[in-house]
Amino acid sequence: MAAMYLPGLRLSRHGLRPWCWSPCRSIQTLHVLSGDMSQLPAGVRDFVARSAHLCQPEGIHICDGTEAENTAILALLEEQGLIRKLPKYKNCWLARTDPKDVARVESKTVIVTPSQRDTVPLLAGGARGQLGNWMSPDEFQRAVDERFPGCMQGRIMYVLPFSMGPVGSPLSRIGVQLTDSAYVVASMRIMTRLGTPVLQALGDGDFIKCLHSVGQPLTGHGDPVGQWPCNPEKTLIGHVPDQREIVSFGSGYGGNSLLGKKCFALRIASRLARDEGWLAEHMLILGITNPAGKKRYVAAAFPSACGKTNLAMMRPALPGWKVECVGDDIAWMRFDSEGQLRAINPENGFFGVAPGTSAATNPNAMATIQSNTLFTNVAETSDGGVYWEGIDQPLPPGVTITSWLGKPWKPGDKEPCAHPNSRFCVPARQCPIMDPAWEAPEGVPIDAIIFGGRRPKGVPLVYEAFNWRHGVFVGSAMRSESTAAAEHKGKTIMHDPFAMRPFFGYNFGRYLEHWLSMEGQKGARLPRIFHVNWFRRDEAGRFLWPGFGENARVLDWICRRLEGEDSAQETPIGLVPKEGALDLSGLSAVDTSQLFSIPKDFWEQEVRDIRGYLTEQVNQDLPKEVLAELEALEGRVQKM
């Protein structure tokens, strides 16, 4: 009898125990409601059959990705009371989740490897790890055995073949997700290229196996109408990079259930990238064209809810400049045969944070979400529209608001009307400024990489790294105010290296080594690295920089630096614009002395904090080159 660990896999060389020892049901005994099992590639067919044996769904639906199928899925969700039509817009819908299922759950998200050190660095004595959670194969096996047998009883298992990146691109990868959530089906159809063409492209090739269940088997008459299915007490999101697998249980929320997103496109892909010599990063990609017609592409890494989407869809305040969007969240990058770093956006949609999005902050996002959008946990207006904090739209007379909790709400109420991590899920093609090359199979050429975060004090508006190695250190030292996208509470300054802290698929020390190794790639033309901070405040707590469309002024300076312009001056932390080098024409008074000040006492403390963090969290796995950069920074700050 063949043993298996996860569905479709044999017992591995590491001795991992199987999920079940029972033989799989034959294809003939599976109740297939839509699609043809016999037409699936053998590997996919085996994965589906074994998973069905484990989870025991009522039936199987193989998704073809068609418009007719999508219409039927949305109708089913509406019938179940899980989504409501928003008649103010064309084909827009609102979902409200269980209040316990509203964000990524980092504490229940694990990487499974035989050796703990493959996943996380060895910590300095007694420290609590912040760079990922490891679970042993045996413990993971027990967790799976506890959760998955029979977990889909009474539900449909949907088979979702999907491509991360344009179908057929050499930079793309294929996954197959099995889920018992129709909400996931509707969302994945937006966020990925999904359906029959993906299976045709896959053939007998390799794919990432993704298994998801809301963790609520139906043994009676189904869910009560409108009850969001989830199992928060048993939630677990597991990644098995050696086997290229993802397993998720108990949550229907996007980051936990749309397995192509953070789970595949960052955690698993970062491990693929290390093994294959490329980069999978939490970065937006944008094209920027100056008034003379010169176009450049940049990638930028900010922690969640720090303005990636706003920057990726920016409407430049500088006359004659144009920004076009390739992607707002994830970049897969590889050097081509000419040594040029090229990037694709592996996603097909935007899964954006709604609160704070308005015609003033992101007019292109507002234009994008007027149709074919699935909103989650935003407020609803009585005239069939949506509402959230910062939407900046006056309500017509007599129009009332229902909060994300389904309760009456009015401006001035203590609780927010929309959850801080409420989302819009919308096809990328609807964005009015999508770059013409956003689906180019070869990717777009990246000339600069930008790191950034929310730093209310001490960190200047923009600075350039001295070189690649220094830039890698700058990425490793990133810190930012915490965001709503995870379950952390309150505003604390958190270390978030490369904006990847929750998304590393392997040991962060080895991730740093991988970034450093790019310097040794034959013929590689390394992008310049910059750091930005739109969020510095004055003593009264007011922002020193207007941000949003005015951020084009910083991109202008970056582009001029890429052209070789001598417009930077050296400081202990990097190269900042010379006085007058930043185009501030037409702006009301900006206090550049505060905006670019580098207080010695702040940076002495910053160095101590960075050293403490890297020593504690990365410890013996910290590359000597990164430690040398830290010591060099410390020496420069001491001489200020």
UniProtKB/Swiss-Prot annotation:
Any single GO BP term: oxaloacetate metabolic process
Modification N6-acetyllysine occurs at: K88
Cofactor(s) essential for the protein: Mn(2+)
Modified residues (Phosphoserine): S115, S304
Keywords, in A-Z order: Acetylation, Decarboxylase, Gluconeogenesis, GTP-binding, Lyase, Manganese, Metal-binding, Mitochondrion, Nucleotide-binding, Phosphoprotein, Transit peptide
Subcellular location: Mitochondrion
Cross-referenced SUPFAM superfamilies: PEP carboxykinase N-terminal domain, PEP carboxykinase-like
Binding residues annotated for phosphoenolpyruvate, in chain numbering: R104, G255, N421, R423
Pathway annotation: Carbohydrate biosynthesis; gluconeogenesis
Family that this chain belongs to: Belongs to the phosphoenolpyruvate carboxykinase [GTP] family.
Function comment: Mitochondrial phosphoenolpyruvate carboxykinase that catalyzes the conversion of oxaloacetate (OAA) to phosphoenolpyruvate (PEP), the rate-limiting step in the metabolic pathway that produces glucose from lactate and other precursors derived from the citric acid cycle. Can play an active role in glyceroneogenesis and gluconeogenesis.
Summary of subunit composition and partner proteins: Monomer.
Protein name: Phosphoenolpyruvate carboxykinase [GTP], mitochondrial
Organism per entry: Mus musculus (Mouse)
